[in-house]
Regions:
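C-terminal helical "tail/cap" subdomain of flavin- and related membrane-associated enzymes
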Residues: 336-437
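N-terminal FAD cofactor-binding segment of flavoenzymes
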Residues: 48-94
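Glycine-rich FAD pyrophosphate-binding loop
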Residues: 29-54
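Conserved acetyl-CoA-binding loop-helix of GNAT-fold acetyltransferases
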Residues: 521, 527-540, 567
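Predominantly flavin-linked oxidoreductase catalytic cores and closely associated redox partners
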Residues: 27, 130-275
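Acetyl-CoA-dependent GNAT
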Residues: 449-450, 457-511, 517
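FAD/FMN-dependent oxidoreductases across multiple families
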Residues: 81, 235, 256-335, 340-342, ...
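Conserved GNAT acetyl-CoA-binding A-motif
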Residues: 542-554
């Protein structure tokens, strides 16, 4: 049985010149050139990208940069990048957390890849121009009909448009969720197994608000603000505020949302605090949609669908640009390697098993969020502030950096379930109160140089290692510079704990603040309120010095230690430490 291989002078027609269609054309022409094949690629695109708006947020997230460079040999030009995105702030009803991807998987290279906000029309034009430069013919016309001709020895595709007529060996549908083209494909493929459009989708509405660079730097920086199931907006599943340099994009999505829900979202105090003043009557709304269920029959004899038309997107964070580029490139690879028959194109479906396989996990996450977000989201955010595994799960869910399957696999840990349950059923106050027991006869006083040996012995009991030279120099320096902030705790004239603090400012552009450098408690006195007594006294002294913020540093992977500081009022700060491994340099 023939697989109908592409040959010299074969014609491939691609309907749609967006990222999926352009990626398919680029991969086809690159592959044909590498194998010495003379291939004709025709792209039909009815939009003028300089005029028509694309109802898409326009965020390029990993691994799209790797796909562009590795698969298509394309480097993103700086001119189309409006802003690099360094993180997301997830908002619940009462809690919020800054998510930068540096949690339990901080060493994973995937979490170091860049995310960019781009102008979709400019990105689409850039991709189409690259396809044209490789030899793709671009016809600026809308396709009106398709005909699959199988009559004796004649087996071809005929494509009709408002201006041109083409005969092709295969047709690629890269038209998104265009109603007219969806209907055309469903009608003409019905006898051959049949394409059926995605059965479910989410509606989206977006608007752009002009902002000055200074306002955006002050209010948003390089952070996308994400709102899951925002209170007061029951139909909104997801809302976001995305900085784009010269303007800010606001969008919402949900199965039953309308433009009135965007009105409600823009009136939320938390949203208005992130936007400049604007006249609601003078801003434009744009309507769009993206699939939340897979299509059926996304390939067949001499045809393949790519991008949104496949429905092979994440149910929550769709990553539509990524899916379009990846499916477009993979469809091209399969056509070149295997052919354009239905049997040959079955390899296209197999090559996208990673996209399709994640669907049921995404549905599970979406249903859980729909049922319990308003009840569980705040406790999950609260746990995520101190637990790296939960932090990563929230980051990956919002950013789309990892599959839902991996998110669920990493997150279903007994200790996470217990922590969330503790927040839900006991409440944060009781959670903190359980740690607040204190012995009544603990006294706090200033540390002296005579206490250094006692501090050293406590540290050795904690760590099992001697640090005599370190503590002698460290403690002496702190006592000399700020004796008010170096304290010891005594019980019956025995030193049972210590803390070294300092007041300094303008490091990393931070205001004057208190620093809690080291705190230690004799293991025999753990759980008796010694550390809380030390911190209470230290913080009181900081306040008398005019300090309003206290800093400390811990290993992000030490969940128990982070839990401890969280119980004592510490939150994850705005700064993230960056490291460079000089040993890896050649």
């Amino acid at each position: 049985m023939s697989d109908y291989r592409l040959h010299d002078n074969s014609t491939v027609v691609i309907i749609g010149g967006g990222p999926g269609g352009a990626a398919c054309a680029i991969k086809l022409l690159q592959g044909a050139r590498a194998s010495g094949l003379n291939l004709r690629v025709v792209i039909f695109e009815g939009k003028d990208f300089s005029v028509h708006a694309n109802q898409c947020v326009g965020v390029l997230s990993p691994p799209v940069e790797d796909v562009l460079s590795g698969e298509l040999g394309i480097q993103l030009p700086p001119s189309i990048i409006k802003r690099q995105i360094f993180g997301y702030r997830l908002h619940g009803a009462h809690e919020n957390v800054l998510l930068t991807g540096h949690g339990a998987t901080a060493s994973d290279i995937r979490h170091g890849r860049a995310t960019y906000a781009v102008e979709r029309a400019e990105f689409d034009q850039f991709m189409l121009d690259r396809a044209r430069a490789l030899g793709a013919e671009v016809t600026e016309s809308r396709v009106t009909g398709i005909e699959f001709v199988r009559d004796g020895s004649l087996d071809e595709v005929r494509v009709y448009s408002e201006s041109e007529y083409e005969r092709a060996d295969v047709v690629v549908g890269a038209f998104g969720l265009d109603e007219a083209m969806l209907s055309v494909f469903e009608d003409v493929t019905r006898r051959d197994g049949g394409y059926e459009r995605p059965s479910k989708w989410l509606k989206s509405y977006l608007t752009t608000i002009e902002t000055t660079p200074s306002f955006q730097t002050e209010k948003l920086g390089h952070i996308v603000h994400a709102f899951l199931m925002p209170p007061g907006c029951p139909r909104i599943e997801f809302g976001a505020i995305t900085p784009k340099g010269d303007h800010t994009l606001v969008n919402i999505a949900g199965e039953r949302v309308s433009s009135c829900d965007l009105d409600l979202f823009l009136r939320m105090p938390e949203v208005q605090a992130l936007l400049p003043g604007f006249d609601p009557a003078r801003i434009n709304y744009y309507e769009g949609r993206f699939p939340s269920a897979p299509a059926r029959g996304a390939y067949g004899h001499r045809y393949a669908l790519v991008g949104d038309a496949t429905g092979w997107l994440r149910p929550f964070k769709g990553k539509g640009i990524n899916t379009a580029i990846i499916t477009g490139a993979r469809a091209a690879e399969v056509m070149l390697a295997h052919g354009v028959s239905k049997r040959a194109l079955a390899n296209y479906r197999k090559s996208c098993s990673d996209l399709r396989g994640d669907y049921r996990y995404g549905v599970m996450v979406r249903r859980l969020m729909m049922m319990g977000a308003r009840f569980f989201l705040d406790p999950m955010i609260d746990v995520g502030k101190t637990d790296p595994l939960m932090y990563d799960a929230l980051f990956d869910s919002v950013s789309g950096h990892d599959s839902y399957r991996n998110i669920i696999k990493r997150s279903l840990k007994p200790h996470l379930v217990r922590k969330v349950a503790a927040r839900v059923f006991s409440g944060l106050r009781r959670y903190k109160a359980l740690r607040a027991k204190r012995m009544p006869d603990i006294s706090i006083r200033k540390m002296t140089v005579r206490d250094i040996d006692k501090v050293l012995r406590i540290d050795e009991k904690i760590t099992g290692k001697p640090h005599a030279a370190y503590y002698e120099s460290k403690a002496d320096a702190y006592i000399s510079r700020g004796p008010e902030y170096c304290l010891v705790a005594e019980h019956l004239d025995r030193v049972v704990g210590f803390v070294l603090g300092d007041v300094r400012g303008w490091e990393y552009a931070a205001e004057l603040s208190g620093w809690m450098e080291i705190i230690g408690v004799d293991p025999e006195y753990h759980g008796r309120g010694v550390s809380r007594a030390l911190m209470t006294e230290l913080f009181a002294r900081f306040k008398r010095a005019g300090v309003t913020v206290v800093n400390t540093m811990v290993n992000w992977n030490d969940g128990d230690l982070i839990d401890y500081f969280r119980a004592n009022g510490f939150e994850r700060g705005e700064y993230v430490n960056l490291v460079k491994n000089l040993a890896e340099e050649t």
